[in-house]
Swiss-Prot record:
It comes from Caenorhabditis elegans. PANTHER family: 60S RIBOSOMAL PROTEIN L38, LARGE RIBOSOMAL SUBUNIT PROTEIN EL38. This is Large ribosomal subunit protein eL38. One of its GO terms (cellular component) is cytosolic large ribosomal subunit. It comes from the Eukaryota. Belongs to the eukaryotic ribosomal protein eL38 family.
Length: 70
């Protein structure tokens, strides 16, 4: 089941959880979507600012698998 997250800090907390398996990054012309797969939910964060999206990408935990989609 998907759930949308509005705050970047909440997304980073979810990404650092033990059951977080992977993060998918999907870039459009208008915004960037970050999707973290946990055990029960797929959490989604939509970021419109490209600079914030780049900073968020760099602040993801190092042990998690990151996959970039088109």
């Amino acid at each position: 089941m998907p759930k949308e997250i509005k705050e970047i800090k909440d997304f980073l907390v979810k990404a650092r959880r033990k059951d977080a398996k992977s993060v998918k990054i999907k870039k459009n012309s208008n915004n960037t979507k970050f999707k973290v797969r946990c055990a029960s939910y797929l959490y989604t964060l939509v970021v419109a600012d490209k600079d914030k999206a780049e900073k968020l990408k760099q602040s993801l935990p190092p042990g998690i698998q990151v996959k970039e989609l088109k």
